[in-house]
């Protein structure tokens, strides 16, 4: 009888052990799938149900971009992974002669700062708050920005970029120049390099001083809801300019859909339509860029109604938007740790792509007045 009990006990132990191994295996598979979802950056290829595979490890291209990203970001970030994809621009005017190649590059990085109060921008804000001692609104906006920035400390961030590599000799990466190829007007990729500490401190100081000097009525706006919408309804297509399958089918689509998309994001954040700003209206679908002084649109409307106001690069909150003046184009801000801004957009479709440091003659940085 004792032997039977012993055998039964051993059998039960064996079954439990096998079950445990299955559970461990399932969790490992899930973690791999989940990690892949996190790093794919919303990529979409010709097959909408598949994600393109990155180039093989230790290729010339990958090693080149690992070194390039280290040069750009190593002062402020730990670069944890770099994924390099071939990129095919959807532009009939581009001729391929071997003198240049295009790449889509996803990087996984993490801020080196252990505390939000170590960020140069925050140091600058604190200096301004101390100078404006007793002004409650200065302290309020300081605390709000601190709360926003805390979520970036210690957590990996995914950043996407589209680069054009220009070779001095065909396919020779030595001495090759890298340009940002996000849109038609290409600029040096070195403009992605973060500002110096002193410049970010100055931005932090100026952010508080400017806000207090131009205080506006506080609006109700859900930044998180707006960002979630922006992430849901765009992607990073590798073989075409846009993937309308992921767009919100409830809205009319436009050949130049950038302002339409940003307006949708702002609406998702809780800003209600009016008799002037509503789907398909002029103010909803036009950028309102200063490039066209006599034509109003989204940018002019949001400023006139004091819903958004101009700020600097580091002071821009996720949930804000950027107007590119020369291109008459708008994009929606989905992340800003005060060092690097990421944006989403339509025409062309972009998701979590880094924005270069453009000056006030090139871009307007608009943040919500909440």
Regions found by a protein language model. Give the residues of each.
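Short, non-transmembrane alpha-helical segments in secretory-pathway proteins
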Residues: 42, 47-82, 224-231
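Glycine-rich catalytic cores of cysteine/serine-nucleophile enzymes that process amide/ester linkages
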Residues: 245-253, 276-282, 325-362
């Amino acid at each position: 009888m004792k032997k039977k009990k012993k055998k039964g006990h051993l059998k039960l132990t064996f079954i439990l052990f096998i079950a445990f191994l299955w559970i461990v295996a399932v969790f490992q598979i899930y973690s791999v799938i989940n990690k892949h979802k996190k790093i794919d950056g919303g990529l979409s290829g010709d097959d909408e149900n598949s994600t393109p595979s990155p180039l093989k490890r230790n290729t010339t291209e990958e090693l080149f971009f690992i070194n390039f990203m280290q040069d750009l970001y190593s002062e402020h970030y730990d670069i944890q992974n770099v994924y390099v994809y071939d990129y095919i621009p959807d532009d009939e005017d581009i001729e391929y002669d071997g003198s240049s190649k295009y790449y889509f590059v996803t990087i996984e990085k993490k801020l080196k700062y252990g505390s939000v109060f170590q960020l140069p921008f925050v140091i600058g804000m604190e200096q301004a708050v101390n100078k404006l001692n007793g002004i409650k609104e200065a302290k309020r906006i300081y605390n709000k920005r601190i709360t926003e920035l805390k979520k970036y400390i210690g957590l990996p961030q995914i950043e996407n970029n589209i680069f054009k590599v220009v070779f001095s000799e065909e396919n020779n990466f030595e001495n090759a120049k890298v340009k940002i190829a996000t849109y038609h007007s290409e600029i040096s990729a070195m403009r992605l390099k973060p500002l110096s500490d002193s410049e970010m401190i100055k931005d932090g100081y100026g952010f508080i001083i400017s806000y207090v000097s131009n205080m506006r009525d506080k609006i109700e706006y859900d930044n998180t809801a707006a960002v979630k919408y922006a992430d849901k309804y765009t992607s990073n297509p590798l073989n075409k300019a846009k993937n309308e399958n992921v767009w919100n089918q409830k809205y009319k689509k436009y050949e130049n859909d950038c302002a339409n998309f940003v307006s949708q994001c702002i609406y998702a954040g809780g800003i209600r339509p009016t008799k002037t700003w509503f789907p398909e209206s002029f103010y909803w679908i036009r950028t309102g860029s200063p490039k066209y002084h006599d034509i109003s649109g989204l940018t002019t409307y949001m400023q006139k109604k004091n819903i958004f106001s101009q700020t600097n690069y580091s002071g821009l909150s996720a949930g804000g938007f950027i107007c590119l003046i020369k291109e008459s184009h708008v994009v929606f801000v989905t992340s800003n740790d005060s060092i690097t801004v990421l944006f989403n957009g339509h025409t062309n479709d972009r998701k979590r792509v880094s924005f270069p440091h453009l000056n006030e003659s090139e871009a307007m940085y608009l943040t919500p007045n909440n």
